[in-house]
Amino acid sequence: MTAIPNVVDIESSSSSLCQETATETVTVERGSSDSSSKPDDVVLLIKEEEDDAVNLSLGFWKLHEIGLITPFLRKTFEIVDDKVTDPVVSWSPTRKSFIIWDSYEFSENLLPKYFKHKNFSSFIRQLNSYGFKKVDSDRWEFANEGFQGGKKHLLKNIKRRSKNTKCCNKEASTTTTETEVESLKEEQSPMRLEMLKLKQQQEESQHQMVTVQEKIHGVDTEQQHMLSFFAKLAKDQRFVERLVKKRKMKIQRELEAAEFVKKLKLLQDQETQKNLLDVEREFMAMAATEHNPEPDILVNNQSGNTRCQLNSEDLLVDGGSMDVNGRIEIE
């Protein structure tokens, strides 16, 4: 970093230069009175020395202007004005304010590079102390009349607020508190999301662990059964024969049970069919009784004769005769 010359040293050097210029001017004038040779060269020399004095004076004012701009304002202006950092911080479309788009990236990378710390809240407090105001409550946008894009010369108009001013202190404290609260909210949101993600990952990991433990337990049980089977097989060579015989008996019992169920179902179907026929006969008889209240008459057409079966008591009274089968016939 280039050191800025002291104002007192510059003033003393400027005054001494002016005195030397005046002395040389008098000397030249005296020489001109003594000798009239080359007057134009003397005039040009005096003019060049006067121009050098003016240039030195302008350089002093530029250095003085730089001295009035604090390092915080100069560095902040450099950060915002750098196009490389536009995704993180940049000028607004009007270039009368600047916007911090990514507060996390700004704190982690830019602040340590220029200010050697990562405290975003401290940076906000510095802005408040220089009179910057928050433009939009939903984002980190700040504005100051002396802080505009392309107008670096206005930085000398920005002054740090006096600590003795009550009104300024109240506004600064209120703004600082609000910005700190907003900063804490901004910092809490990613932390909450991260905590939720970690909690979900923990629950998923626990669920996976339970599933793996169940699978391991199942595999252990199967291995124990297999080891027990092989142990029995090694001790008793006829174990397989008994196992096969037991299996066959089980299959036979299952077949017999299936055959029994099949026969039972068949008998049930036959019984159901018989019951249906009986019910149908009873229903037909009841229907005939309801439609013909006189005694039932049976007409037999096989022999070509018409025979009517009546009640025995009524026909015997009327002089009917009974055949071998016990039926009463009327010709």
Swiss-Prot record:
The keyword Transcription applies. Residues 14-26 have a biased composition (Polar residues). A motif (Bipartite nuclear localization signal) lies at residues 245-265. Residues 69-163 bind DNA. One of its GO terms (molecular function) is DNA-binding transcription factor activity. It is found in: Nucleus. Gene3D superfamilies: Winged helix-like DNA-binding domain superfamily/Winged helix DNA-binding domain. Keywords: DNA-binding, Nucleus, Phosphoprotein, Stress response, Transcription, Transcription regulation. Residues 14-39 are annotated as: Disordered. Pfam families: HSF_DNA-bind (PF00447). The hydrophobic-rich region (HR-A/B) corresponds to the oligomerization domain. This is Heat stress transcription factor A-9.
